[in-house]
């Protein structure tokens, strides 16, 4: 079953199906012209048992073919989701993956090594979103299947790039882009509004975990 993504009119995840890119030159939009990495298997992981230190500020730095952006995790709203994202990032789960779904003016979505829209780490966590959760530009939340309970999360995430006011509060709020929102917006321009597929591969080279002391 494919993950049911947030939507304006019931949009669902689609397979990326990105073709070849180029020789790592830079395109007019400021993104590297790169080849999409080969899809790889997912699953087989267990949910982390370790809780994050809530006295610290935890961040994820995404190094992508369109630049770098930083997400500050929301441990108050989604502590289990945050711990899972940190664990997956430290394990290199997100390295050399793509944004397989890009809807201009709405969301960019990634976190699936299989590039099919079906992938996940082999487990889920649940952090019910707070009542009245607002999915505004720059908010990072977790995709789930249509039948999953509110706040269910695997590895796939989406970043709001436009008006998310119509999104029901059903998706775990992982955090907010606190640096590099222009990079997120740049990525958000590289999708086909009809198919929701990327017009060129946008690769996540690596995700680095940070925390203050």
Predicted regions and their residues:
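Cyclophilin-like peptidyl-prolyl cis-trans isomerases
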Residues: 2-213
């Amino acid at each position: 079953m494919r993950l049911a993504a947030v939507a304006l009119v019931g949009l669902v995840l689609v397979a990326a199906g990105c073709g070849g890119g180029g020789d790592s030159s830079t395109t007019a939009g400021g993104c590297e012209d790169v080849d999409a990495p080969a899809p790889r298997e997912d699953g087989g992981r267990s949910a982390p048992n370790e809780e994050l230190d809530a006295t610290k500020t935890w961040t994820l730095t995404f190094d992508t073919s369109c630049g770098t952006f930083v997400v500050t995790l929301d441990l108050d709203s989604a502590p289990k989701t945050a711990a899972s994202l940190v664990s997956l990032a430290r394990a290199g789960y997100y390295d050399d993956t793509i944004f397989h779904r890009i809807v201009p003016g709405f969301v960019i979505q990634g976190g699936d090594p299989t590039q099919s829209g079906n992938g996940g780490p082999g487990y889920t966590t649940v952090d019910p979103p707070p009542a009245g959760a607002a999915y505004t530009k720059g908010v990072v939340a977790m995709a789930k299947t249509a039948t999953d309970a509110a706040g269910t999360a695997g590895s796939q995430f989406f970043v709001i790039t436009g008006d998310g006011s119509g999104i029901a509060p059903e998706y775990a709020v992982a955090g907010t882009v606190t640096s590099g929102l222009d990079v997120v917006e740049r990525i958000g321009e590289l999708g086909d509004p009809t198919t929701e597929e990327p017009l060129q591969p946008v690769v996540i080279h690596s995700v680095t975990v940070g925390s203050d002391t």
